[in-house]
Amino acid sequence: MENLMVIDSVCTYCGVGCDIAANVNVAENKIVNIFAHPDGVVSQGKLCIKGKYGFDFVTSPNRLRIPRIKKTFLEKNPSIKDTIAHSLKEYDAIWFETDLDCATTAAAMKLKEVQEKYGRKSVCSIGGARTSCESSYLFQKFTRHTLNSPHVDNCARVCHSPSLKGMRTTIGEGAATNPYNDIYNCEFMIVIGSNTTEAHPIIANRILDVAREHDNLAVFDVREIKLHRFAKYKAIMPHEANLLVLNMLAYVIIDEELYHENFLHERTKGFDEFKEKILNDPFANPKYFEQIEGYQNLSKMIPKIAREYALKKSMIFWGLGITEHLDGSYAVMAITHLALMTGNIGKSGAGLMPLRGQNNVQGTCDMGMLPYYAPDYQEPKEIGLMTPQLVEEMLEGRVKALLNIGEDIMHIHPNLNKIERAIENLELIFVQELFMTEVAQKADIVVGVKSAYEKTGVYINAMRRLHLSQPLVQSDLPDDWEVLQMLDNKMGGSAEYKNSNEIWDEVREVAYRRFSGASYIRLERHRVRGLQWPVHTEDTPILHQLDFRTEDGLGEFHYHQYKLRGMVEEISSKTLTGYHLTTGRTLAHYNNAAQTKESEKLNSRYDEDILLVHEGDAADFTGEKVILKTEFGQTNPLTLKFTDKVQPKTLFVTFHHAQSKINNLFGDKCDELILTAAFKSIKVEVINT
């Protein structure tokens, strides 16, 4: 077609960060179709269905185009209403429409009032992992410097913060050690707590290619997933047994002296103490599983996996099935221990790969959108509170204003009933979004912004690869950073960036240890290959080749014993009753489905959350639908599907659709160190309807 132009960019969905190209009708300013970039280093000519078909949201009639202010907010704040009255237009019974200048003026007036009344720390900022690095950087800078509040956080809190904590504790860097294509140089692979084919399918393609050719894959999960079909070792675990299994792998490596003595001597510390503790840990011997009915086969399978891992060039992949537990950070440390013991790190075909969830959650953490890290993981001048702590502060009346960018805390966070009570105490909720998500509906002021397919910016994927995106279509909506700059100026700040490039140049100066050599010009020149941080004269595809990024350059062992609890404790004491639930994604949707549900091709595949139940448990499920209930709340009625892919007395459900209210079930149980919610296991009551 005459008006078609092919434009390259990066996929807006998961942390894999696939290279995409789009046929764009320039005359109509419309994406015709999206396909894998033919030379894409990440996508390698393939995209998942979200990448291919999940672009209808860009032109959806449901997009937020004009800023809105809630009428009840203006009734409570008459001086603000008087100031912006000239711009207000009736939208519906709940909202006025206004312009961006007045929306940010109203927000700034209220922010000043809140801080004058309750103090500088009464304001918090949450979000950023769905937007560009430039916007994330400015979000934390505006909050910390202009508002002088230390309270910044992002959705890594509910996903991979334990990976960051665990890896930085042991090897000094909380990111993937290798590029994806190193999978092809790998001799053995362990996947644990990751439904990779559904959540990260383009990485799964590589894993499956190698597994089919070499029969060298071990898969650990609490239910049977697609990867198990291609695995040499098909390990089904009881719920909450990650740390138990990982310590057992380490036990076998130590007991059979399969560790790499030279590597341990030259590049690590603390191994002798670690060795003594693990050999004396009653839970570390794989024979423990001989007494766990239904899982006895693990007692023989775990030693076989440990031997192959130790004696071959090996990689470990993990997802939220590891991190969203009480001991998520400790389990990540246990994963790194395996690599340190065997020297399976710092070289091609051997390493560690946390499979990040959001398209820019790696970049947002790199930008310092965390309460305990400034940009480049430097120590901030003041440590703020993590999101669960901020919710408590809201309930106590000490935090009174929330700034939110693209993080639906009313859908993806735990204990939604508690969060709803907390935000009712706020005097200002200011949200930047694409759609009227659950949190946007609760907002006092909501501003529509550009999507990733409408702007220029840097995104960093799960393998530390920087991709300079470019807009596929043009939009007159503001970028997130432009809204923040307006707020900053009205709050007395001095931000005067002309474009995202100027912000990125500042990032390169502030976070020079990672990005000094990653100019826009260079990123544009290497758009197809991408550059992996740290980027100086050259980039760094493989981390830790000579030293770990700890203070002394040595990897460190930090042993943590498994704590008997949950399903394992119930089975061992023969008191197993009721049902244990775990949650996860499906291929057709992405997290809260705000974008994917706008695509009929995607939503028609999975238009409701479905509860998977073992066939043998059918007698307990007599209704057409069931409600799940815990002490914290209950779901709405859920459709059932009986299958042999989940274990007896275990259930699985996705959480994509807000109307399901899945996260009502979860309370405050969380990772001990980093407060990531324990989404992956909870005991539920079944109510037939």
Predicted regions and their residues:
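N-terminal export/assembly segments and adjacent metallocofactor-ligating motifs
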Residues: 1-258, 267-270, 274-280, 298, ...
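Acidic/polar loop patches that form or flank catalytic/metal-binding clefts of enzymes
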Residues: 32, 259-262, 315-316, 344-354, ...
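Flexible glycine/proline-enriched surface loops and loop-helix/loop-strand junctions
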Residues: 230-231, 282-286, 318-322, 465-473
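Phosphate/diphosphate-binding loops
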Residues: 9, 16-19, 418, 425-437, ...
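Long, contiguous, secondary-structure-rich segments that constitute the structural scaffold
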Residues: 476-526, 598-611, 617-689
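Extended redox/cofactor-interaction regions of prokaryotic respiratory oxidoreductases
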Residues: 137-208, 213-220, 244-247, 336-445, ...
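Active-site phosphate/pyrophosphate-binding segments
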Residues: 249, 267-386, 533-536
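N-terminal leader/propeptide and maturation segments of large enzyme subunits in energy/redox metabolism
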Residues: 80-96, 258-297, 472-541, 604-605, ...
